[in-house]
Amino acid sequence: MSTASDARFWDRTSRKYAAAAISDQAGYERSLERTRALLGPADRVLELGCGTGTTALQLAGGVQSYLATDISAEMIAIAEEKHAAGPVPALVFRTATAEALDGQFDAVLVFNYLHLVRDLPGTLNRIHALLAADGLFISKTPCLGDMNPLIRLALLPAMRAIGKAPYVSAFRAAELSQSISAAGFEILATESHATKGKDARPYIVARKR
């Protein structure tokens, strides 16, 4: 599968994705509150992989500007529907990837995104370039390498082979941290926000060096 086929996958599943409940609502709320505390009213924020815009709509009211992007045009269409129902002046949705963007941002947010990119080092380097000096890079990422090996070794490859899953990387949390540091970031905090079961989704706050 290519990035174009990844986009088609998310286009096909966008309505089902939008209707699905958040598996750990309390953990999600914890991540939202932590992120709000890190952002200020003068901040220019970029969110990559925003999906149907749920997080963007929660956070955009507290910053100067908030650009929320996703590879899937159908996901962005749903996000725009939500935005029309409850407008937030600072918020703009756009179909785009990190590689297609320019400008400077004070914070880049990526939630449930980094395991889906095909070139993790390249994406991290691009995020670094998009950040202003001392800008914050805030992420929360499923680390499949720390999950049940049957998922990454059998189930996901089989689902990808028949078009039932997008591209997914199965790195460990330690490997993700190493990649973030190697891209020119200082990791300020690594936190666990889950309230159910084992947490394999580290919430990482990093600063551009």
Language-model segment annotations:
Residues N112-Y113:
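Short catalytic micro-motifs in class I SAM-dependent methyltransferases
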Residues L46-L48, T52-E99:
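Class I SAM-dependent methyltransferase SAM/SAH-binding core
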Residues A158-A174:
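Acceptor-substrate binding/catalytic loop of class I
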Residues L109:
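A conserved beta-strand element that flanks and buttresses the S-adenosyl-L-methionine
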Residues P121-A133:
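A short glycine-rich, Lys/Arg-flanked "PGG" loop and its adjoining helix->strand segment in the class I
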Residues A183-F185, A189-R209:
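Core SAM-dependent methyltransferase catalytic element
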Residues M1-G40, I138-R160, A194:
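Conserved class I S-adenosyl-L-methionine
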